[in-house]
């Protein structure tokens, strides 16, 4: 995210993100929030394409770029809509290779909602339609359902999500690059869902302040650093044969301890109640203290 998203630090500027990346040892970091008009102008003013790494960007002020952290152009969008008679709230991560593609996507999305209201805009459109707009902006767009198990705002969310990727994205399911674990789950938990065998699994920090950068991350092995090789790595990592490794693939993810994640268990913080799913079922989904839904 950037400083233009709600509940984020004012230090989340391009410079602040690079400083955090250097401290944490991160080579590639997302800009976040590229649809926000003010932030997009700031990104265009401060970033230039990396001379050797296609699809990556560096700060103009960077004196030495050879080993400096680089940016990818990223955006999280909140899709709020009704589908099959149920309200849906779904967060989707979009990654694009250049500013021309960003401009095309922003032009399309500003007809649907107010992009200046929030760095992570809330748009009245389906996840499927957002995916189509991203691919129309650039056929190499990366579409990643964000923190897919978050109850209220995700593809598999128990409150407003779906039971499958295909049910959510329809014909666009073929174009999903990967799924993001979120802080409350890890790859081992996600691999228990057979449908996810066809998708790469990634983890990101979802930072709302510089110190949260890198609390989760994805480690890639690539022939050379570039947008296309990251894209190829995601494609190759859905069903990875470790005996015949491709040139580009996901080596591993760095995980937050999922049991400490906000949504790993059900509960009420104010009532000091925390339940595993079995306990939730025994209590009919209600808090034993206040009798409200967990």
Spans of model-derived segments:
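C-terminal functional module detector
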Residues: 19, 37, 45-48, 59-63, ...
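Internal metal/ion-chelating core segments
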Residues: 162-213
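Short secondary-structure boundary/capping segments
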Residues: 10-12, 43-49, 158-163, 195-196, ...
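Divalent metal-dependent hydrolysis catalytic cores, especially in the metallo-beta-lactamase
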Residues: 18-39, 142-144, 178
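Active-site-proximal loop/turn and secondary-structure-junction residues that shape catalytic pockets
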Residues: 35-36, 77-79, 147-150, 183-185, ...
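Extended substrate/RNA-proximal surfaces in nucleic-acid metabolism proteins
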Residues: 40-177
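Acidic/histidine-rich helix-loop elements
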Residues: 2-11
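Hydrophobic faces of well-ordered beta-strands that scaffold small-molecule active sites
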Residues: 1, 29-31, 71-75, 143-145, ...
């Amino acid at each position: 995210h950037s400083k233009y998203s709600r509940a984020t630090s004012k230090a989340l500027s391009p410079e602040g993100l690079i400083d955090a990346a250097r401290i944490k040892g991160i080579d590639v970091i997302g800009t976040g929030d590229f649809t926000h008009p003010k932030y997009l102008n700031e990104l265009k003013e401060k970033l230039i394409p990396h001379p050797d790494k296609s699809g990556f960007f560096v700060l103009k002020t960077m004196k030495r770029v050879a080993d400096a952290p680089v940016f990818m152009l990223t955006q999280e969008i909140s899709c709020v809509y009704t589908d099959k008679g149920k309200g849906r709230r779904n967060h989707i991560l979009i990654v694009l290779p250049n500013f021309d593609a960003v401009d095309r996507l922003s032009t399309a999305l500003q007809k649907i909602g107010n992009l200046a209201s929030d760095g992570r805009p809330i748009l009245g459109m389906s996840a499927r339609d957002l995916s189509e707009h991203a691919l129309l902006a650039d056929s190499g767009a990366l579409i990643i359902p964000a923190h897919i198990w978050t109850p209220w705002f995700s593809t598999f969310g128990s409150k407003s999500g779906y039971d499958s990727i295909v049910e959510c994205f329809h014909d666009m399911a073929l174009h999903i690059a990967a799924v993001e674990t979120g802080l409350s789950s890890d790859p081992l938990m996600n691999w228990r869902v057979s449908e996810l065998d066809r998708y790469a699994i990634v983890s990101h920090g979802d930072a709302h302040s510089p110190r949260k950068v890198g609390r989760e991350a994805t480690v890639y092995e690539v022939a050379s650093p570039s947008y296309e090789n990251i894209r190829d790595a995601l494609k190759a990592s859905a069903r990875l044969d470790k005996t015949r490794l491709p040139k580009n693939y996901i080596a591993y993810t760095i995980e937050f301890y999922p049991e400490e994640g906000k949504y790993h268990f059900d509960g009420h913080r104010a009532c000091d109640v925390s339940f595993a799913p079995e306990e939730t079922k025994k209590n009919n989904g209600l808090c034993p203290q206040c009798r409200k839904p967990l």
